[in-house]
Amino acid sequence: MKKTKIVCTIGPKTESEEMLSKMLDAGMNVMRLNFSHGDYAEHGQRIQNLRNVMSKTGKKAAILLDTKGPEIRTIKLEGGNDVSLKAGQTFTFTTDKSVVGNNEIVAVTYEGFTSDLSVGNTVLVDDGLIGMEVTAIEGNKVICKVLNNGDLGENKGVNLPGVSIALPALAEKDKQDLIFGCEQGVDFVAASFIRKRSDVVEIREHLKAHGGENIQIISKIENQEGLNNFDEILEASDGIMVARGDLGVEIPVEEVIFAQKMMIEKCIRARKVVITATQMLDSMIKNPRPTRAEAGDVANAILDGTDAVMLSGESAKGKYPLEAVSIMATICERTDRVMNSRLDYNNDSRKLRITEAVCRGAVETAEKLEAPLIVVATQGGKSARAVRKYFPDATILALTTNEVTARQLVLSKGVVSQLVKEINSTDDFYRLGKDVALQSGLAQKGDVVVMVSGALVPSGTTNTASVHVL
């Protein structure tokens, strides 16, 4: 059974009910909507289509809204055509938005472009395809020397590696998009270009103000500043997306894999979800099979301990969206089989919290008894994630009375969530847990299961692990 979850970006190729149903069958767990593209009518229809499929088939999936985020882009060029730049030539960026660009100058969207940069800084355009070095700053213009040949287009992203940028965490478009997400009841927001703790706090306050206090925030780490402030960002977030695309432009490409491993490790320790994203099966946008390197990359992220792996263009606009999900699911299943439990987490001398100690003990017991299932009663999802932290061989069945928690746990590795009407007592939980275990086919008659619970209210009081035979 596949334990690692798959996030699929849904676009024109995959938005129909028929395709969404096939994607769920193939292994999709979370639908990602990329708000850098599309309008509210399109995204609203995609959400409706997925909900229709779920209500017809009983399948479970969560919805993730990915913000455009505060970014710098090039503006207009003459005739809207790309211009060819040559290595060694001089090229100018201006903050005067009325300028129509050519092969010597282009306007950018960011007012503070001239004040944030200094001579000697690097400017990268279009995911780093064109590099330039700042040679002078004059008024509202930044004059650069072009470092390599390339074609510059309109609306292309501009990165300033190693430069601290004074952009707000939420652009005006993001604020409107988040309100739309609150109205639609999405489960997660993936917040782009998070640089510091206050960015996350600002987004959380905006969500709360519009009825989205239950929406979980997944912070995307895409630059050096985000890496430098990673610990404080993690503390303020519900999860992290390792956004390797922009990150690989902002920091040296050979550093990306080490940043990935560091972030995944810290997320596991903090019991926060982590998604590994970007270019995972990139060649499948055009080809029916991935490269061997891509297959290895997906497996490597899973071995690192990621909760989920993500498809972007592969499932949104590629030629082989279904094949991409199927192949990714196959790699997940194969790699999940060799993952061993990690009971040595917290070998540091830190004292365990009660919940963590009980959950660790439950995993250890399940391993020793070869139990196929650990059943957890959870209100907000923390207990289920505390069990997941130790990578049990057993599947984690999370029973919750909270519909939001049931959907959000869809993103956690190895967790199957089940919404139940009510749990009135510990005995009630044991009875319910056994019933669901058998009905779902996750365990058979005669199997040993470990059950984890606590005081029924309030949440956060897990204190009991017990062993039962079905």
Swiss-Prot record:
PROSITE patterns: PYRUVATE_KINASE. Optimum pH is 4.0-6.8. Belongs to type I PK; fructose 1,6-bisphosphate-activated. GO terms for cellular component: cytoplasm; cytosol. Its EC number is 2.7.1.40. The keyword ATP-binding applies. Keywords: Allosteric enzyme, ATP-binding, Glycolysis, Kinase, Magnesium, Metal-binding, Nucleotide-binding, Potassium, Pyruvate, Transferase. Catalyzes the formation of pyruvate in the last step of glycolysis, it is irreversible under physiological conditions. The reaction is critical for the control of metabolic flux in the second part of glycolysis. This is Pyruvate kinase I. It comes from Salmonella typhimurium (strain LT2 / SGSC1412 / ATCC 700720).
